[in-house]
């Protein structure tokens, strides 16, 4: 097995470490958003920054609108934005008619992300009076994204004005491409079903940071030969694509197109086109074309739009069509710090039903793959089958459900102070066919009728508690209760953002033995996993 840390520059930047412990305020969020790539970097703190960003957006802050556009790609934030704005959508309409071209552009993008049919009339009105060419493509694309008869009629009646000068030619080409892409949204593609890979491919499985070893172990247990292990991904060379989804410790599976190659857009487009024209028809039912979406990631000064245009110009044809509002394949380009490009295909035709039990979630809910990977990391310290397990801060129930997926349990109990959390946890447990039971209570008041074998907890932090001082009180109370909740020799697995605090408190409890720990990285934060045994 080839185990090493990748040095291609794909690791996250150091932005997060400089503000990880600085409380966010409206002023801090405004300052950070104004920095180069500010909206992208603030996604590390999305849940904390979101309310401040919306307030700034309502005041006409273009960077805040760009940040909300990124948030709206996630369903929970899109739903939250639509709830906040209601049917009047005054803030969005005002932004669309602002005197700032960038704000108008970002507002149009946000409308496209939110996909509310009633916004079409505002986009039509704004497009009819828009005199800044670089803004129009976003309005056209959003009409295509929202869809419907009214949007289609608006696009059919629209004419891209010719370039009046050489300087306008770039904007003319961008507007023309946006118009074509928007119109493609109304094409009826034949829906394809994934059958199987027709040949072995290099598959990169993304794991939570520093939890790639548990994933590699899980893959080996399912008969896969691991070819490489990096800090946050594992590689396998296989044609059994569907078999990979028996494993739970990864967030996504990417088929590698090329690795550390020339980042020239034309060269990348040719490679992606050649690779996918052979792969897609061979492993799907139905005939081409396949709609795709191009995602370009990377640090530093990267002109994503220019790269995308040049790649699309090469790739589009009988087999592939750029259709970001109606796609079955995501073509992902990740440009590393050393300049090398990594290209992947993510097939949305593959139905990943591993976590389909998660019918609802809370804003701070842990990703199920993270819960699965943490449990796999601590597997050798767990009680195995027939253990009784407690989660005193259960939230949506993910940790308990994933514990039961690892090994059958004799009992699972979740406690949470939030009625909403308990309702969500019960719904998820029912969908999972879990035996878990949930209790609405303050965990500090919860008493165990008889000691449990294991405890798992994603400890609250930040706005979920209120302050560092509140964390200190809560964490001290939980550690004080561990010997009451767990039998002697029992195990507690704690996941927390408060590494220093929790480690200090553990030292102050001689009846608790720290067995192992690991610090990871998640969205710019530095969570830690602690495995504790009760009794020396």
Which stretches of residues belong to each language-model region?
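Non-catalytic nucleic-acid substrate-recognition regions in nucleic-acid-modifying enzymes
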Residues: 160-163, 186-324
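Nucleic-acid modification enzymes, centered on SAM-dependent nucleic-acid methyltransferases
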Residues: 287-373
């Amino acid at each position: 097995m080839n185990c090493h840390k990748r040095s291609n520059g794909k690791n996250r930047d150091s932005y997060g470490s400089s503000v990880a412990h600085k409380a966010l305020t409206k002023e801090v969020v405004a300052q950070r958003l104004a920095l180069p790539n500010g909206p992208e970097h603030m996604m590390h703190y999305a849940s904390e920054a979101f309310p401040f960003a919306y307030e700034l957006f309502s005041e006409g802050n273009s960077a805040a609108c760009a940040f909300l556009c990124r948030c709206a790609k996630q369903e929970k934030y899109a739903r939250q934005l639509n709830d906040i704005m209601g049917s009047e959508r005054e803030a969005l309409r005002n932004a669309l008619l602002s005197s700032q071209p960038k704000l108008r552009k970002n507002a149009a993008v946000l409308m496209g992300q939110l996909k509310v049919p009633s916004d079409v009339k505002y986009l039509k009105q704004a497009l009819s009076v828009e005199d800044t060419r670089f803004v129009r493509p976003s309005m056209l694309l959003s009409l295509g994204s929202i869809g419907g008869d009214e949007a289609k009629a608006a696009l059919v009646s629209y004419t891209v004005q010719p370039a009046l000068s050489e300087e306008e030619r770039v904007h003319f080409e961008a507007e023309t491409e946006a118009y074509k892409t928007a119109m493609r949204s109304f094409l009826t593609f034949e829906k394809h079903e994934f059958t199987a890979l027709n040949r072995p491919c290099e598959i990169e499985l993304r794991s939570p940071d520093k939890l790639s070893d548990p994933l590699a172990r899980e893959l080996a247990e399912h008969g896969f030969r691991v070819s490489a292990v990096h800090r946050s991904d594992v590689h396998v060379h296989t044609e059994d694509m569907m078999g990979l989804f028996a494993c739970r410790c990864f967030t996504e599976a990417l088929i590698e197109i090329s690795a550390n190659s020339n980042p020239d857009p034309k060269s990348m487009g040719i490679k992606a086109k050649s690779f996918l024209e052979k792969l897609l028809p061979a492993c799907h039912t139905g005939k081409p074309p396949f709609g795709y979406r191009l995602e370009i990631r990377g640090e530093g000064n990267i002109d994503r739009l220019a790269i995308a245009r040049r790649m699309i110009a090469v790739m589009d044809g009988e087999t592939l069509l750029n259709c970001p509002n109606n796609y079955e394949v995501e073509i992902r380009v990740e440009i590393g710090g050393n300049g090398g490009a990594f290209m992947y295909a993510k097939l949305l035709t593959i139905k990943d039903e591993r976590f389909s039990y998660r019918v609802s979630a809370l804003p701070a809910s842990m990703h199920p793959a993270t819960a699965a990977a943490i449990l796999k990391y601590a597997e050798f310290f767990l009680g195995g089958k027939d253990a009784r397990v407690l989660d005193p801060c259960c939230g949506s129930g993910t940790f308990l459900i994933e514990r039961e997926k690892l090994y059958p349990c004799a009992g699972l109990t979740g406690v949470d102070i939030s009625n909403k959390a308990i309702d969500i946890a019960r719904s998820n447990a029912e969908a999972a066919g879990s035996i878990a039971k949930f209790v609405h209570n303050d965990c500090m008041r919860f008493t165990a009728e008889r000691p449990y074998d294991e405890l798992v907890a994603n400890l609250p932090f930040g706005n979920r508690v209120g302050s560092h001082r509140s964390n200190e009180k809560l964490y001290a109370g939980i550690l004080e209760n561990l010997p009451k909740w767990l039998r002697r020799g029992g195990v507690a697995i704690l996941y927390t953002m408060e590494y220093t605090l929790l480690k200090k408190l553990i030292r102050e409890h001689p009846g608790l033995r720290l067995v192992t720990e690991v610090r990871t990285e998640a969205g710019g934060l530095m969570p830690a996993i602690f495995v504790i045994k009760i009794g020396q």
